[in-house]
Amino acid sequence: ISGQGISGPENLAFICRSIAAAFFPSRTAIKSRSIGTNRNLRNSRCKNLYFVVCSNKSVLMESYMADQIKEAYQSSKNIYDNVLTQRNFFSRLYAKVFWSGTDDNEIAHKVLSYIPDDFDGTILDVPVGTAVFTEEKWASLKNAHITCLDYSTDMLEQAEKRLNGCGHIRCVQGDVGDLQMDDTAFDVIVSMNGFHAFPNKEAAFRETWRVLKPEGKFIACFYIKGKSGITDWLVGNIFSKKGWFTPPFQTEEQLRNILNRLYKAIDFHVDGSIAYFCCTK
């Protein structure tokens, strides 16, 4: 990242190490993925997993996956922006080889263009990440009230630094699957590169719908499977194992079906393996 001493070769080395990890997982990684028994739980490196007798295995799995996601983004925060924004040759090469040349900058521009420049309502940005794509737009909406939420405190800290001094913006830590917010609280919900990481996607769709006002806009972009074999391989064998992405993932048809059940007036597009859209509740 510019200003943090993260070079192009370091980005490439990071990606290569991730690929190697897919073929040669460490003993620790194998242990941390085994959560079927109390013994395996004690071997796990998850910090916030409580050792309780629980008949619902999905509760334990969700807690484990949430911690895995938090730790994954903490370990990668120094190269996160650089890879997404394709600031150098190596990150552009990575996007061309593994993501069919999809430009996240262009998709971010299209997503944010759904929000008028004179917007003065309420916005929920979840997950805000580091605010690398939204900083300029959110800062310009002086008459709006914007809530930026992320599960990762490390990502949130970077977003807070970027958005510091914007009195109309507040940053909060939280879980998209259990939003501590009133029903119909927001005019617009934005979710950029989030749903492919959320461990409980059903809850995320339900909660974002719940806090959105009638006639409100749900605007998002994220990975969908079935568009590129090499991208699907990367996601399934590396990103999911590292905790950056969390299965299950939707195909285009499955995602369209979900949105059609919840929303109307859907403007839906696909660029490579990324879907982006704007829906009206």
Predicted regions located by residue number:
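A short acidic, Gly/Pro-enriched loop at the edge of an enzyme's catalytic core
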Residues: 177-189
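Short alpha-helix
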Residues: 246-262
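Conserved class I S-adenosyl-L-methionine
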Residues: 62-117, 132-136, 155, 219-241
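A short SAM/SAH-binding and catalytic strip from SAM-dependent methyltransferases
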Residues: 188-200
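Core SAM-dependent methyltransferase catalytic element
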Residues: 262-281
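A short glycine-rich, Lys/Arg-flanked "PGG" loop and its adjoining helix->strand segment in the class I
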Residues: 202-214
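Class I SAM-dependent methyltransferase SAM/SAH-binding core
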Residues: 122-178
